[in-house]
A protein has these predicted regions:
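Nucleotide-sugar donor-binding patch of glycosyltransferase catalytic domains
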Residues: 61-62, 93-182
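Donor-binding and catalytic core of enzymes assembling or modifying cell-surface/extracellular glycoconjugates
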Residues: 10, 19-109, 115
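Short, solvent-exposed loop/turn segments at secondary-structure boundaries
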Residues: 16-19, 159
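A short, flexible beta-alpha/helix-coil linker loop
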Residues: 10-13, 152-153
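A generic structural signal for short coil/turn motifs at secondary-structure boundaries
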Residues: 13-16, 146
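Nucleotide-sugar donor-binding and catalytic loop/hinge architecture
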Residues: 1-4
Length: 182
């Protein structure tokens, strides 16, 4: 069965989509006729996310279950990457996967995924940015992209992630998947 990867974590808490938004997005994704494989490592951040995942149909939790090599293979087999600004996003970009990336305070011009198709990365900060096979979501508030490690610049919460609607992310994924199935 076809599947997408949902990678809800990142190395730092200030880059992680809030739990309520993550859950809402997963509920929407589980309603699509496609498998959703949740990935992550076995570190403290990912384990905390794993312990709070909702039980949903079509959703398969592999957090802490794959090596990096196995993740590369899993990513290669997937149709798309949905998730945070992290190494896994860049792996998917290198594999020419369809990407739906959620960014917090990170500077897109420096850290956005590379589109092999267009031979470029993001060139400006925008709430929704499409280029090649990549869609990036980032809040439309004055402080974005501050580049700080959270609003306190000490690895705390990034309020900008609360401004990215799970419904908006889902709508982009649904539109893409509807066209893939045609």
């Amino acid at each position: 069965k076809d599947f997408v990867i949902f990678h809800p974590s990142a190395q730092y808490n200030y880059k992680i989509y809030p739990q309520h938004s993550r859950h809402e997005l997963l509920v929407h994704l589980s309603d699509l006729d496609i498998g959703v494989v949740i990935t992550g490592s076995n570190n403290q951040i990912d384990t905390a996310i794993k312990n709070k995942l909702p039980a949903l149909s079509n959703v398969f939790d592999l957090i802490g279950e794959t090596t990096l090599e196995e993740y590369f293979a899993l990513s290669e087999l997937s149709l798309a990457y949905i998730g945070m600004d992290t190494l896994n996003m860049h792996i998917a970009a290198a594999q020419n996967k369809r990407i739906f990336a959620i960014f917090g305070p990170t500077n897109l011009r420096m850290w956005s995924p590379w589109s092999n198709q267009l031979q470029k990365s993001a060139t400006e900060d925008m709430p929704i940015q499409n280029y090649g096979n990549i869609t990036i979501f980032q809040a439309n508030i004055p402080c974005v992209a501050c580049g700080n490690a959270g609003c306190d610049n000490e690895h705390g919460k990034s309020e900008c992630l609360d401004h990215i609607s799970p419904q908006m992310v889902f709508n982009e994924v649904k539109n893409w998947y509807t066209n893939v199935r045609l």
